[in-house]
Amino acid sequence: PKKNRIFYTYGKNNSFMIEKEKTIKLNCQKKTEKGKIFAVSASSKPSSLILDVLKKYNVSSYTPMHSSYKFCVIATGEFDFYAAKERAYEWDYAAGHAVAENAGAIISTLENKKFKYGKDDYKNLSLMIKRNEILDA
């Protein structure tokens, strides 16, 4: 809403953004400079764990951003990567997860395990979203 965008999905390869009354199909196609990896972060001062992950994936820079909007800007191709330690609940991620994954993003834990829902306490494990396997192209 802050940027006058609405995101929605209704299944694999069917994620969309409505902006300025125009519907755009999302496919995670990179819209930033090739050869560089741009990440979103939940904080302006990421933890040492997250900084290590950003370094491991050769992230060029990161931008702090709140809410599941982070998932959506990866689906648009405006950013390439997001990593988060254990901190949120399933309902905090579910809608953004659906939009990003159905646009082609790869979503897992930081340990590259499948991200699961339906846990007894609803607490999320760590999270990693990659625009695709080749982040800088």
Q: Where do the PLM segments sit?
A:
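Oxyanion/phosphate-interacting regions
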Residues: S48-K56, K70-A137
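Acidic beta-strand-loop-alpha-helix segment within the catalytic core
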Residues: P1-F71, N124-A137
